[in-house]
């Protein structure tokens, strides 16, 4: 794909703080038209700095193209008008809700006769059309956030940058708001870069994710791979891998055996070529073992025994804390995969596929 077919193309982009400390270092990051990308990372990783840099609000070094145009040789105001940034903070003018949203269109030269309809369409999409004549100062935190999102989407931007869009929203309406943003972006063909600490937002929204640590992209992949196969232990903890266990390998002339710190030992079917420190086992890789379970018919299956410490019955999922050796494993098992009931203080067996083990 040629560079003018990307809405964003960053090469060797660096940003320094006021104290000359490097806070962002992007070797290569591209976004295609219509692509939905999530940005993961701990606090202070540079996520908001990345969005401000893309929106040309942050001085930087390196090469960046927006909409196929070299930023250094193009009017930055014109480029910025083709994108929209919704800040984490609720930044609204001391004016009515209607005028806050309308000013976005006026700044972009939208014909006056089209403004009213577009403003109400944007407000309605995020359930705040009834707030149109209210002062922005009178809004609750959640209402102000929805108005900010409406401001971001009213202009049909080619690139939408969202910094924690679900912050301040009630838990009950977050999925609805995120789904609406996704729907509108897909209808318009807009590319979106979404920063969020809420993994539910990310799972419902993005097809691709980048993991940002200390200002650097450490993994760029589809969501399933990042969640199941994180590149290091830091990211494994961030995405919520249930079980991260120290391990070592025992090799023979014919095979490699993995021995975990809790005493579990199993034959591993693949090759281990890089230095690694921990074995990651997601809770949903486990099955509660039963003699009739189909896990017996899977290759490389591992069966372990432990003492149930705690059981949490959720909607459709049962979370079970099982003490194995000196460590506790967490298994998340579909309720219909459990034969009978599981209670604390009883001995149960768990089974998993060795190929589901991931090493970092």
Please give the residue ranges for each predicted region:
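The feature captures the beta-strand-to-loop junction immediately N-terminal to the Walker
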Residues: 40-42
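Conserved ABC transporter NBD signature motif
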Residues: 62-71, 79
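Conserved ABC ATPase "signature" region
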Residues: 113-131
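Conserved ABC ATPase signature
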Residues: 135-139, 143
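Catalytic Walker B motif of ABC-type/P-loop ATPase nucleotide-binding domains
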Residues: 160-164
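Glycine/charge-rich catalytic "coupling/switch" loops of P-loop NTPases
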Residues: 262-310, 337-360
């Amino acid at each position: 794909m040629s560079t003018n077919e990307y809405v964003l193309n960053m090469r060797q982009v660096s940003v320094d703080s006021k104290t000359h400390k490097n806070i962002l270092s992007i070797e290569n990051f591209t976004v295609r038209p219509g692509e939905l990308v999530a940005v993961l990372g701990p606090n202070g990783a540079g996520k908001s700095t990345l969005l401000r840099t893309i929106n040309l609000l942050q001085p930087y070094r390196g090469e960046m193209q927006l909409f196929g145009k070299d930023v250094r040789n193009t009017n930055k105001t014109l480029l910025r008008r083709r994108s929209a940034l919704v800040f984490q903070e609720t930044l609204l003018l001391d004016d009515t809700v209607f005028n806050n949203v309308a000013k976005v269109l006026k700044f972009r030269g939208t014909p006056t006769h089209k403004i009213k309809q577009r403003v109400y369409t944007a407000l309605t999409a995020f359930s705040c059309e009834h707030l149109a004549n209210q002062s922005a100062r009178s809004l609750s935190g959640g209402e102000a956030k929805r108005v900010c999102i409406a401001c971001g989407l009213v202009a049909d931007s080619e690139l939408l940058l969202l910094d924690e869009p679900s912050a301040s929203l009630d838990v009950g309406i977050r999925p609805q708001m995120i789904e609406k943003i996704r729907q509108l972006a897909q209808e318009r063909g807009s590319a979106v870069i979404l920063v969020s600490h809420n993994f539910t937002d990310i799972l419902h929204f993005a097809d691709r994710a980048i993991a940002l640590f200390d200002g650097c992209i450490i993994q760029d992949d589809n969501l399933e791979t990042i969640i199941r196969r994180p590149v290091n232990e830091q990211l494994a903890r961030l995405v919520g891998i249930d079980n991260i266990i120290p391990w070592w390998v025992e090799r023979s002339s014919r095979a490699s055996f993995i021995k975990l710190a809790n005493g579990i030992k199993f034959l591993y079917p693949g090759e281990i070529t890089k230095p690694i420190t921990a074995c990651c086992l997601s809770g949903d890789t486990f099955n509660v073992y039963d003699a009739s379970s189909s896990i017996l018919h899977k290759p490389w299956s591992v069966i372990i025994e432990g003492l149930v410490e705690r059981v949490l019955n959720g909607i459709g999922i049962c979370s079970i804390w099982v003490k194995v050796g000196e460590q506790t494993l967490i298994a998340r098992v579909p309720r219909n995969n459990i034969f009978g009931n599981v209670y604390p203080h009883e001995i149960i067996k768990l089974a998993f596929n060795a190929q589901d083990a991931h090493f970092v």
